[in-house]
Amino acid sequence: MVKESDILVIGGGHAGIEASLIAAKMGARVHLITMLIDTIGLASCNPAIGGLGKGHLTKEVDVLGGAMGIITDNSGLQYRVLNASKGPAVRGTRAQIDMDTYRIFARNLVLNTPNLSVSQEMTESLIIENDEMVGVTTNINNTYKAKKVIITTGTFLKGVVHIGEHQNQNGRFGENASNSLALNLRELGFRVERLKTGTCPRVAGNSIDFEGLEEHFGDTNPPYFSYKTKDFNPTQLSCFITYTNPITHQIIRDNFHRAPLFSGQIEGIGPRYCPSIEDKINRFSEKERHQLFLEPQTIHKSEYYINGLSTSLPLDVQEKVIHSIKGLENALITRYGYAIEYDFIQPTELTHTLETKKIKGLYLAGQINGTTGYEEAAAQGLMAGINAVLALKNQDPFILKRNEAYIGVLIDDLVTKGTNEPYRMFTSRAEYRLLLREDNTLFRLGEHAYRLGLMEEDFYKGLKKDQQEIQDNLKRLKECVLTPSKEVLKRLNELDENPINDKVDGVSLLARDSFNLEKMRSFFSFLTPLNERVLEQIKIECKYNIYIEKQHENIAKMDSMLKVSIPKGFVFKGIPGLSLEAVEKLEKFRPKSLFEASEISGITPANLDVLHLYIHLRKNS
């Protein structure tokens, strides 16, 4: 049977959900092919969304019309702001989720979205003519025609599950791997490599002894992810903290020879920042204990996920390890931990739209691009979906810059640098992180969302009004010069604030940590009518004014630099500071400007700085 649509999405994980929903929302006829409809939106690993860097991604996806934020707000079990005591740039919202509620909410959203159809089958091969996508074939002899195809297969491409010495061809425990499509992608000449990730054991909630374990609560004023969420008052459950101990470590050491990670059974590289427990014991042998979090998987507390205990050790060893841990002495394992090895395509094969350079109309998103994490997958799925629709309409692509969004950082890192290990987002990856805070996501991306038709006009008008009020009042505060007069000193004293000794402007005064929103309204009467969202932005802009201005200067400098032309016949060889790889790529592609050079995979900002300097030096000489 032959069926037609505008866009095909292959895979119903977090990337596939966002890609299919956003494309349908933008008016395309979308068909989602997934192996099991019941597993759409399944959280395969930890029962949580968000965190440091990841919370930023989730909120950016939300503002740009994505679903992850609203699904999380409707399925969370505990909400917290991580790094709450630190500056706003490095804070991150995180939620424990009810995995069943999340999956059901996501699945129903997909199944009830106009312009979006779903079928349960396995994609086996791509149909390509003249290096352009035409469609796909499936395992039940269906042919789907579409000009745009988005592959979001997660860990299913040639997936192999490892538990001790045992191996099974699975894309997830108990589910078939996608071997035909994996072979097809290799035959098409893509640079295919292997990665590894893992998951932790789960235990029955009624078999845990919680007495004596440290209880971990959610925030009293729980944060939420979606700007559309109203009247947020979730039921929150506690997590619990326990630790491994020297006995645990000895059990693991005694079984290193049976660990797939060390026996040579696993070839793929695992996530650096989420190592297995056996890897931690091996690498950090001096540590006497490692922290573990017991996280409820559902509101019923029937199962707990042991966060921090990712493992692929044999079943009998997993039993001994778990029973050596305080609170888990009599725990019943409901699901064992395992490692999974899978194919991914080097993301340097992609443009910034996530379209492959090799085949027009083919987009990749999620773990197939070498990333790890639900949030990273969702962000890529969203951007692939948006760009596939824009390409169908012959409109300009939507590419976020590194100074606009963490999504921009994520995609730029992937397509220019590639990866040899599962890529995870952190705030430290963003050089402009002071501008890319969670609290200003709406202000950063609202304009884009509205332009793309992904934000309602009334809300957008209110947002623009808020932005104007922020700018106007910051200008007024800068122009407001205060002197240490009797009246000023008296008012500061009434607010329990230290006196000023010299002239200061309003921005400098509000930069004080102690000057909260209530004091702001009290001291500057013109701030009194402003809503809390506007006041909060004014406060943050004042506090980090010097650093924010510096980052804006750096952005302007970079934008100016990228406009610099590279002289015809320019010799790249012999320039100190340029790696051999950079020289080879520059000689091969012969960019006409620094902007064109910046688009070449493997060319770093440091390379551009060096090039800029030597272009200038050679012109002057």
UniProtKB/Swiss-Prot annotation:
Keywords: Cytoplasm, FAD, Flavoprotein, NAD, tRNA processing. GO terms for molecular function: flavin adenine dinucleotide binding. GO terms for biological process: tRNA methylation; tRNA wobble uridine modification. SMART domains: GIDA_assoc_3. FAD binds at G11, G12, G13, H14, A15, G16. NAD-binding protein involved in the addition of a carboxymethylaminomethyl (cmnm) group at the wobble position (U34) of certain tRNAs, forming tRNA-cmnm(5)s(2)U34. This is tRNA uridine 5-carboxymethylaminomethyl modification enzyme MnmG.
